[in-house]
Regions:
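C-terminal luminal/periplasmic domains and tails of membrane-associated envelope-modifying transferases
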Residues: 1-112
Length: 112
């Protein structure tokens, strides 16, 4: 079997996301994001941002959001706000979650 590339892990993570298997999303994200050949299409980070948020790795989710935002602020800002609005609706309240949502709201001028 050939060595797996970013696309392989992205597809696996996206499928796991559809089943809300957040641990698998994070596992595939770790593999995908550690590769030196991964393309940086900001929207392709969203599945991993969502996965990290759902397992409580809020700082990692925020960091990936920032790196996506830096590529194209005009487009990514609105998209990230929609993603984080959904994350806020789907995740349980916690101090870390609140801090992450506040940080995202301030950085991207979101209405969360």
């Amino acid at each position: 079997e050939p060595e797996h590339d970013f696309c392989y892990y992205f597809q696996k993570a996206d499928l796991a996301r559809q089943f809300k298997d957040w641990d698998s999303v994070v596992k595939y994200g770790e593999s995908a994001l550690s590769l030196s050949d991964h393309p940086f299409e900001p929207a392709e980070q969203f599945v991993f941002i969502e996965g990290y948020a759902h397992v409580g790795e809020w700082e990692r989710a925020v960091d990936l959001s920032v790196s996506s935002y830096e590529v194209s602020q005009d487009v990514m800002g609105r998209m990230l706000c929609r993603l984080w609005r959904r994350i806020g609706e789907e995740t349980a309240p916690s101090l870390e979650r609140g801090a992450a949502l506040e940080k995202v709201q301030n950085m991207f001028a979101c209405d969360l």
